[in-house]
């Protein structure tokens, strides 16, 4: 549903830096690190950030388990989602009907008809005036999966072994670990989650 897609925006609440010179891959990886830290603190009461670079010294989380969590978020894209209200949808329907009407009128005119040029200009102007809707940041399944690797000392330029999605052993087990963010969300919301 639209509400479920909008809810994925919780994980888009990371630092955003679009300044020139930003390494896009480093920014993407840093955003995932931030998502994992937020998920751990908010949903599990655990600080997971230390395990980004090494096995956690206080919480029973290994670096391998950290990157297994990383794998859940690594295969997501970060699009904007349009969320039109009922009013905007109604205005768009009216707008679409008017566009269709002008297109029909245009198709009935001969190529040399003097009325054609002003009608084409009106149609172009009308198409640009399509009612807009609010947008929100969401997460979506990536079309082409990325390979997830553990990073030596948390450095994305030093990839190590390949990692499969999974959850920390200190928490209850994920029944079907197939790398799906929806399965992860269901696991987080499970009654067995502390």
Regions found by a protein language model. Name each.
Residues 2-13, 80-194:
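Short, functional "switch" segments adjacent to catalytic/cofactor/reactive centers
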Residues 3-97:
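Sequence context surrounding c-type heme c attachment/ligation sites in exported
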